């Protein structure tokens, strides 16, 4: 049986079966990426609920695995060369799991780079912009008197959604076949409803994106993974 004692996080969130991947997460947009990927790939794993409060994400145990105090994070007891590996950052986790299994990165070397390209687009653009949009639209409210930040993130969200909408023309998935790029993108699109921002970003004017998101969550693995571990 694998020995995960070198990972202090297992003292706060003990592994019932240390031979399988350990997921530390919540079903936020970033958290869903990891759980949906694990479900799509059929990998055995345990999900540990990590609250977003300081007692959890800023605990010494969690910081030992992710010093950036964000979910998700994983430990794979069967990492490179058969040695355990801990990882944080949802994009890195997606790429790792895809490379571990040889799946969800397309059929050709070019497909692989296109999938990674769109993961980076989500990590560097769509996720940060929609996250800030959600803060200023749903949470900040009247406390922010200056309208410019809110307008900036609305406009940038519209721009990014147009990029995605155009790129989806004539295809079901962003690189043509289903990949980790779609797993990176769709949970953030889904967050727009939670942020009550669909009308603000012109969701109804998009030709391809709404059907793309519906298609994504119609996948059984995506439907299962969207609420793991339960809130």
Label the model's feature ranges.
Residues 98, 188-189, 226:
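Active-site-flanking alpha-helical
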Residues 51, 180, 229:
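Short, solvent-exposed turn/loop segments enriched in Gly/Ser/Thr/Pro and often Arg
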Residues 92, 208, 221:
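Residue-level recognition of oxygen-bearing side chains
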Residues 1-151, 174:
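GST-like domain detector, emphasizing the conserved glutathione-binding G-site
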Residues 139, 230-231:
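Carbohydrate-binding/catalytic loop surfaces
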Residues 48, 226-227:
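Residue-level detector of family-conserved "landmark" positions at structurally sensitive sites
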Residues 118-218:
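GST-like fold's C-terminal all-alpha helical module
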Residues 64, 218, 227:
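Phosphate-coordinating loops and pocket residues in cytosolic domains that bind phosphorylated ligands
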């Amino acid at each position: 049986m694998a020995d995960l004692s070198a990972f202090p996080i297992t003292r706060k969130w003990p592994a019932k079966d240390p031979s399988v991947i350990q997921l530390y997460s919540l079903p936020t947009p970033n958290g869903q990426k990891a759980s949906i990927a694990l479900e799509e790939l059929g990998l055995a794993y345990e999900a540990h609920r990590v609250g977003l409060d300081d007692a959890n994400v800023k605990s010494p145990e969690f910081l030992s695995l992710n010093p950036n105090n964000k979910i998700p994070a994983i430990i794979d007891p069967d990492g490179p060369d058969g040695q355990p590996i801990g990882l944080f950052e949802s994009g890195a986790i997606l790429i790792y799991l895809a490379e571990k299994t040889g799946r969800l990165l397309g059929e050709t070397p070019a497909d692989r780079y296109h999938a990674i390209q769109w993961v980076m687009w989500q990590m560097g653009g769509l996720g940060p912009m929609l996250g800030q949009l959600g803060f200023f639209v749903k949470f900040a409210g009247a406390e922010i008197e200056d309208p410019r930040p809110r307008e900036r993130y609305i406009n940038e969200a519209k721009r990014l959604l147009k990029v995605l909408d155009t790129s989806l023309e004539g295809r079901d998935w962003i690189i043509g076949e289903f990949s980790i790029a779609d797993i990176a993108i769709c949970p953030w699109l889904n967050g727009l409803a939670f942020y009550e921002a669909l009308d603000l970003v012109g969701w109804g004017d998009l030709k391809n994106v709404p059907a793309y998101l519906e298609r994504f969550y119609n996948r059984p693995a995506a439907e299962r993974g969207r609420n793991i571990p339960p809130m």
